[in-house]
Amino acid sequence: VSEIPARPAPEITGHAAPFWAAARAGRLVIQHCPACGHFQHYPRPWCVHCLHEEPEFVESGGEGTVYTFTVIRRSAVPAFAARVPYVLAFVDLDEGVRLVTNIVGCDPESVRIGQRVRARFEAIDDEHTVVLFAPVD
């Protein structure tokens, strides 16, 4: 039995550290600008809408809709090749931000654009947890 190679870990930068810390705790957070009310993801040191510095992190409801997706059937990356087929998707959170993620917990052929999904978390090592999504039952 061969072992599945370790999944590549995300690079945790200063502005994104609160996002990854929350993911390790099983929470999905996104940035919110206290000046203009804009939500954004990926984490940045300023609001992309009004340029206010230091947007705050707020907890997301963790649900959204599949905007688009593809089923990966072949991967040149060993850590992902062992997992094919898998779904790579863009998910629009209810708060209005879009994340690139995987859809898990279902047959890849059952995923549909417009499908409701909910955040799930997968620890890939002691320091890194990734945010994935699964269909809402």
What are these regions (language model features)?
Residues 69-75, 122-126:
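Short, conserved beta-turn/loop elements at beta-strand boundaries and strand-helix junctions
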